[in-house]
Curated annotation (Swiss-Prot):
A single GO cellular-component term on record: cytosolic small ribosomal subunit
Keyword RNA-binding: yes
Superkingdom assignment: Bacteria
InterPro entries cross-referenced by the UniProt entry: Ribosomal_bS18 (IPR001648), Ribosomal_bS18_CS (IPR018275), Ribosomal_bS18_sf (IPR036870)
Family, similarity comment: Belongs to the bacterial ribosomal protein bS18 family.
Native source species: Cellvibrio japonicus (strain Ueda107)
Gene Ontology MF terms in the entry: small ribosomal subunit rRNA binding; structural constituent of ribosome
Protein name per its UniProtKB record: Small ribosomal subunit protein bS18
Pfam families in the cross-refs: Ribosomal_S18 (PF01084)
Reported function: Binds as a heterodimer with protein bS6 to the central domain of the 16S rRNA, where it helps stabilize the platform of the 30S subunit.
């Protein structure tokens, strides 16, 4: 029975010392959105609750301002 080593999840924003998550930082936000447009939960990403709330608000704000799409492109 082989045991697989799982990498410990850590909060990227705590490690970087981020105070606020900016809704204009599209590349950072895209890392926390699935290809279907859903926000990835913190139990998968390892983000702390404080930053997960900021992340959700920033993603919703960016969607509202049409910086990122609500869903994937329907072609």
């Amino acid at each position: 029975m082989a045991r697989f080593f799982r990498r410990r999840k850590f909060c990227r924003f705590t490690a970087e010392g981020t105070k606020r998550i900016d809704y204009k930082d599209i590349e950072t936000l895209k890392a926390y959105i699935t290809e279907t447009g859903k926000i990835v939960p913190s139990r998968i990403t390892g983000t702390k609750a404080k930053y997960q709330r900021q992340l959700a608000t920033a993603i919703k704000r960016a969607r509202y301002l049409a910086l990122i799409p609500y869903t994937d492109s329907h072609e």
